[in-house]
Amino acid sequence: DIYCASASQMFYVPVEKHGFNSHLRQKGKIAELALGYGGSVGALKAMGALNYGLTEDELKPLVDAWRRANPNIVQLWRDVDRAATACVKEHSETTTHGIRFRYKSGMMFIYLPSGRKLVYVKPKMGLNRFGNESVTYEGIGEQKKWLRLESYGPKFVENIVQGLSLIHI
């Protein structure tokens, strides 16, 4: 059970679904679902963490524990963010973890090992909602209208994983 495994890594104790430390499984589940693509305290709240017995004071330590237990994922977020940023800033090509980023004809292409491409229209550097520099691009927002969207390492990783997971039947 992935949620038991996650909780076990985070809290350094064995966790069994209906056995030892089973009370920690729910924390592992919420953390796995909310934090895997860069979420933090806000994502935990959005996933209902406070409704599942977690307290406000437990949320930040839970984020920290998940990230400590998953250093390779956190590093992948950073590496992908650096690659996308370099690609957009320098209008160049760069590769990380077998994933190629290329700027061409006003678009950023992410070439996946499967051969599939992800395309980001009119990418440029801008400020995100926190006031930090990030890659932005034109896309369709929640209101089904074109607008400038911000992105960052974990979001690109989410798109990459989804792109790799698609199956044609």
Regions found by a protein language model. Give the residues of each.
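Conserved catalytic core of nucleotide polymerization and phosphodiester-bond processing enzymes
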Residues: 1-167
